[in-house]
């Protein structure tokens, strides 16, 4: 049998053998060093180098992740602060509304939004009642139509907030048009609104008012002439 532990006097060793076989004590693959506690440790040179390299790479990667995360948090805080400063300067810049109407107006507008959501829900109009026949009314069809389900809650909320805080509401619209929406889109829907509302509804309303006024004037004049003729004949 091959003895890897050299010749040892078994009578003196009491069964104890060296920790490292003799053939490996001078190997370049292993190293022995003393740690601060005074204990000696045996380590593989190549394994230690690989673990140290892997540990350094992992620490470097974690450090990059930490720096990236801190950078993202800092950028997010800057963006939030920018939004706050912008809102104070361009939207919530009316002290009287900020003190008295913005908060209650916002809460009531939120309630209006929920009310609109309830109004456009088909089940709230009795559509799921199976005991009695259900016949949809015109108002129900109008409220539960697809455009109403999309727009009605938002329209009610916007109208309510505009009633309570008109200047802040207008500032919000201006900020959205100037800084969020594309200029071409804003110009396009302004032209469309002008054509439909101002040149359409308002113009027809004024024309109808003028026609009614002219008709009334003619009728009054005719009635006065008839009355004058009757008085002359009398």
From Swiss-Prot:
GO terms for biological process: cristae formation; positive regulation of protein oligomerization; protein-containing complex organization. One of its GO terms (cellular component) is MICOS complex. It is a multi-pass membrane protein. The gene is MIC27. It comes from the Eukaryota. Residues 121-141 are mitochondrial matrix. Belongs to the apolipoprotein O/MICOS complex subunit Mic27 family. Component of the MICOS complex, a large protein complex of the mitochondrial inner membrane that plays crucial roles in the maintenance of crista junctions, inner membrane architecture, and formation of contact sites to the outer membrane. The chain crosses the membrane at residues 101-120, 142-161. Component of the mitochondrial contact site and cristae organizing system (MICOS) complex, composed of at least MIC10, MIC12, MIC19, MIC26, MIC27 and MIC60. This complex was also known under the names MINOS or MitOS complex. This is MICOS complex subunit MIC27. Keywords: Membrane, Mitochondrion, Mitochondrion inner membrane, Transmembrane, Transmembrane helix. Disruption phenotype: Increases frequency of mitochondrial genome loss. Partially altered shape of the mitochondrial network with condensed, fragmented mitochondria accumulating at the periphery of cells. 20-40% of mitochondria exhibit an increased inner membrane surface and stacks of lamellar cristae disconnected from the inner boundary membrane. It is found in: Mitochondrion inner membrane. Residues 1-100, 162-234 are mitochondrial intermembrane. It comes from Saccharomyces cerevisiae (strain ATCC 204508 / S288c).
């Amino acid at each position: 049998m091959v003895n890897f532990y050299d010749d040892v006097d078994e009578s003196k060793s009491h069964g104890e053998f060296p920790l490292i076989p003799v053939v490996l004590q001078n190997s370049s693959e292993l190293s022995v060093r003393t740690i601060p506690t005074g204990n000696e440790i045996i380590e593989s040179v190549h394994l230690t180098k690989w673990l140290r390299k892997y540990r350094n790479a992992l620490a470097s990667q974690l450090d990059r992740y930490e720096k990236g995360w801190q950078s993202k948090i800092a950028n997010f805080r800057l963006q939030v602060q920018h939004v706050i400063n912008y809102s104070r300067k361009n939207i919530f810049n009316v002290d009287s509304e900020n003190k008295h109407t913005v908060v209650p107006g916002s809460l009531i507008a939120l309630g209006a939004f929920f009310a609109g959501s309830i109004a456009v829900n088909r089940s709230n109009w009795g559509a799921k009642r199976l005991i009695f026949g259900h016949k949809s009314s015109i108002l129900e069809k109008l409220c539960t139509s697809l455009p109403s389900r999309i727009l009605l809650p938002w329209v009610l909320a916007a109208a309510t907030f505009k009633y309570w805080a008109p200047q802040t509401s207008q500032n919000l619209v201006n900020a959205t048009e100037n800084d969020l929406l594309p200029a071409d889109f804003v110009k396009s829907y302004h032209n469309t609104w002008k054509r439909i509302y101002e040149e359409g509804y308002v113009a027809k309303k004024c024309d109808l008012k003028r026609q009614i006024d002219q008709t009334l004037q003619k009728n009054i004049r005719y009635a006065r002439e008839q009355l004058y003729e009757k008085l002359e004949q009398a």
